[in-house]
C-alpha cells in the first residue's frame, strides 16, 4: 500500500454524514439552522454575562466559558462541513486536519474539566453557602478556567503530534465529519494498536474522574436539597442543577461513546451521528437549557437586548 506523499497539495478526504445521508439537502439545511442557533444563543449569552454586572459571579463566569467553548467547538467543524458539501469538495490538508484535531480536542477536554468545576461551584453554593465567596473567589474561579484551558491544550497538543507522526495511506478516505483520532488511525499505514490502547486508557482517565466528581457533587447537593425547609429554595436549586445535569448527560454520553466504548461497538454511521450531536446539536442546545430555565439570565438578556440591540421604544 502506497504511503502518504507529504506535499503541500496533499490532503485527506472527509466523508461526513452529509455525503452519506439519504436527504443531504434537508440535513444541510437543518445543520445550518442549528449552527446559526448555536452562534446566536451562545453569542447572546456571552454578551449578557459580559455586559450585565449582576451576572459577574463565579457561576455565570463559568457558564460564559462554557458558551465560549461551545461556540469555538462548533465553529471548528460546522462551517467547513457545510462549505465542503456546497462546493462538492471534501478535501482537507494535512496541516488543516492537524489543526482541526488540536482545536476539537482542546475544546472537548476543556469542557470536560469545566463541567466538573461547575458542579463544584454548585456544590459549594448549595451545601456551604456561608463560605461560598471564600471558596469560589474571583481568583479561584479564574484559576479553574485557566486550568481547564491549559491542561486541555497540552493534552490536545500531545495527542495531535503523536497521531500525525504516523505514515498515512494514499487514496484513503476518513469517513467522519471531522479529523478525530479513532478515524484517522484507520488510514494509518502502521501498527497503531498500542496507541489505540493508550488513547482508550487516557480517554477513561480523562473522563471518569471528572464524571465521578460531578456525580459525587450532585449526590451531596441532592441530599442537602431534600432537607431544605423552603420549597422555593428547593425548587430553585433543583432547576439550576437539573440544567447542569442535562448538559453533563449530553456531553459525557457522546464522549463515552466515541472514546471509551471499544471499537467493536462502533459503526461509521453511528459515529457520524454522534459527531453531529456533540459538535452541532449540543452547542446549540446548551445555552437554551441554561438560559430558558434561569430567571436571572433571562432578565439579563432582556435588559441587554433592550439597551444595546432594540429600539428605544422597545417594550422589553
Swiss-Prot record:
Give GO MF terms, alphabetically.
G protein-coupled receptor activity; olfactory receptor activity
Q: Which InterPro entries match?
A: GPCR_Rhodpsn, GPCR_Rhodpsn_7TM, Olfact_rcpt
Keyword set for this entry?
Cell membrane, Disulfide bond, G-protein coupled receptor, Glycoprotein, Membrane, Olfaction, Receptor, Sensory transduction, Transducer, Transmembrane, Transmembrane helix
Name the major location.
Answer: membrane
Residue stretches spanning the membrane: 26-49, 58-79, 101-120, 140-158, 196-219, 237-259, 273-292
- Give GO cellular component annotations, separated by semicolons: plasma membrane
Positions glycosylated per UniProt: 5, 19
Q: Which PROSITE patterns match?
A: G_PROTEIN_RECEP_F1_2 (PS50262)
Against Pfam families, the record matches this protein to: 7tm_4
Tell me which parts of the chain lie in the Cytoplasmic compartment: 50-57, 121-139, 220-236, 293-316
* Residue ranges annotated as Extracellular topological domain: 1-25, 80-100, 159-195, 260-272
- Which BP terms in the Gene Ontology apply to this protein? detection of chemical stimulus involved in sensory perception of smell
The protein's topology relative to the membrane is: Multi-pass membrane protein
Q: What intrachain disulfides are recorded?
A: 97-189
On the tree of life, the source organism's domain of life is Eukaryota
Q: Which family does it belong to?
A: Belongs to the G-protein coupled receptor 1 family.
What name does the UniProt record give this protein? Answer: Olfactory receptor 2AG1
Q: Which organism is it from?
A: Homo sapiens
Query: Gene name, please?
Result: OR2AG1
Amino acid at each position: 500500500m502506497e504511503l502518504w506523499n507529504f506535499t503541500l497539495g496533499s490532503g485527506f478526504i472527509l466523508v461526513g454524514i452529509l455525503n452519506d445521508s439519504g436527504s443531504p439537502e434537508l440535513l444541510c439545511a437543518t445543520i445550518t439552522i442549528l449552527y446559526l442557533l448555536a452562534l446566536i444563543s451562545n453569542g447572546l449569552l456571552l454578551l449578557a454575562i459580559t455586559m450585565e454586572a449582576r451576572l459577574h459571579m463565579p457561576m455565570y463566569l463559568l457558564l460564559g466559558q462554557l458558551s465560549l467553548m461551545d461556540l469555538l467547538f462548533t465553529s471548528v467543524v460546522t462551517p467547513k462541513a457545510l462549505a465542503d458539501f456546497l462546493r462538492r469538495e471534501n478535501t482537507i490538508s494535512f496541516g488543516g486536519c492537524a489543526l482541526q484535531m488540536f482545536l476539537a480536542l482542546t475544546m472537548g477536554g476543556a469542557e470536560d474539566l469545566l463541567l466538573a468545576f461547575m458542579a463544584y461551584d454548585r456544590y459549594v453554593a448549595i451545601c456551604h453557602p456561608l463560605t461560598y465567596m471564600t471558596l469560589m473567589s474571583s481568583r479561584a474561579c479564574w484559576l479553574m478556567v485557566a486550568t481547564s484551558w491549559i491542561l486541555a491544550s497540552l493534552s490536545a497538543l500531545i495527542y495531535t503530534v503523536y497521531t500525525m507522526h504516523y505514515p498515512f495511506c494514499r487514496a484513503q478516505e476518513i469517513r467522519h465529519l471531522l479529523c478525530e483520532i479513532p478515524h484517522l488511525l484507520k488510514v494509518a499505514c502502521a501498527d497503531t494498536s498500542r496507541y489505540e490502547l493508550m488513547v482508550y486508557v487516557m480517554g477513561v482517565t480523562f473522563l471518569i474522574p471528572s464524571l465521578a466528581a460531578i456525580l459525587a457533587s450532585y449526590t451531596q447537593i441532592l441530599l442537602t436539597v431534600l432537607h431544605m425547609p423552603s420549597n422555593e429554595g428547593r425548587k430553585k436549586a433543583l432547576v439550576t442543577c437539573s440544567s447542569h445535569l442535562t448538559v453533563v448527560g449530553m456531553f459525557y454520553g457522546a464522549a463515552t461513546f466515541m472514546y471509551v466504548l471499544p471499537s467493536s461497538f462502533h459503526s461509521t454511521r453511528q459515529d457520524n451521528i454522534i459527531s453531529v450531536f456533540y459538535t452541532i446539536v449540543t452547542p446549540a442546545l446548551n445555552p437554551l437549557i441554561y438560559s430558558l430555565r434561569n430567571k436571572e439570565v433571562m432578565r439579563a438578556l432582556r435588559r441587554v437586548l433592550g439597551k444595546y440591540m432594540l429600539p428605544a421604544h422597545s417594550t422589553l
